[in-house]
Amino acid sequence: MKNIAIRTDASHQIGIGHVMRCLTLANELRKQNNATVFFVTRKAEGNAEEKIKDAGFEYVELDTGVDAPISYLNHGNWLRAPQLSDAEEFKSALNRRGVFYVDLVIVDHYGIDYLWHKQIKNFTKKIFVIDDLGDRLHDCDYLLDQTYSCKADKYKNLVSSECNQYLGTLYALLRPEFEGLQPVKVDENSLLVMFGGTDPDNLTLKVLNVIENMSYLDKINVVLSGSAKNLVEVSTYCQSRDLISLHISPNNIAKLMAESKLAIGAAGTTSWERCVAGLPTVAVIQAFNQREIASSLQKAGVISYIEANNIDDQLKDKVSEWLIALSKDNDYMEKCLDVCDGYGTNRVVSGILND
């Protein structure tokens, strides 16, 4: 599959996670098959344009669209256009770049379902969908849901029987730096605070205000994207505190995770990265789709979670409980590694190319 188009979006509303996992998949497709990959995304604040271009992929921008298009989908307004219109824009934008047919279209968007897929059937050989909600119909050849303990019955009536399904963390899309990562036992009480790329609700600062005066903490590493909405405010806060180090769009996240004893962050796609690094987490739920991930990982014994509106009341106790438990028991690292091994990207791409 030499020509591939990806339809995904990022913004302060949506976050950057969809683009990041598509970048991981695109990198592996390029590595294994020398594919040319086009990212088609809507213009928006925080739309990850620079990340896509810096990775060396073709960037194709759609206009900003409308604020709240009428849709029957739970996240239909995220698309900022009716589905059929978006599909035609997608094809037209690629046509203007001299692309009239592709081998594979990858779709990672909660605002897209089977209607969009049908509209682009004459434009592509295969369709690959990334989802984790299981709340809408798909007309695709491949479906990936990397949620821990995901089972086939989740999509029983949502995809055809011919669809190749990649389900569970065995297929988690992680960057190459996590393949073969060797977690080490961490003695110092070092925390990693990381809420994804844009952190529009500024949970980073809310967390830091709660934990910075905990007397038994040795170090706090904070990770934010250069496109984070509140980067200046967080940066100013961190600069005046010796305990805290701010890392902006670092390229050594796996190392930072492996050198931390406990993380505080969202229950999104970085959950699998933390597990590969053997890093337990206090997860803060900030979106409904994170609750399924958080619940399953709490049952596995690798996280505990709180709601975002309970940070002030519950976070300090959760951190204390974890640090006490980790000082007595090393089994938590093994529990994390049982969730995800870090080789999912290779498995997915090998499956596509060998189909």
Predicted region positions:
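Acidic donor-binding loop of glycosyltransferase active sites
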Residues: A258-T269
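A nucleotide-sugar donor-handling region in carbohydrate enzymes
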Residues: D139-N202
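Donor-nucleotide binding loops and adjacent catalytic segments primarily
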Residues: N189-E259
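Conserved nucleotide-sugar phosphate-binding/catalytic loop shared by glycosyltransferases and other
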Residues: A35-E88, E307-N309
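C-terminal alpha-helical cap of glycosyltransferases
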Residues: D341-D355
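A short, well-ordered alpha-helix in the C-terminal region of glycosyltransferases
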Residues: K328-G342
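Nucleotide-activated donor-dependent transferases that construct or modify glycoconjugates
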Residues: K2-G15
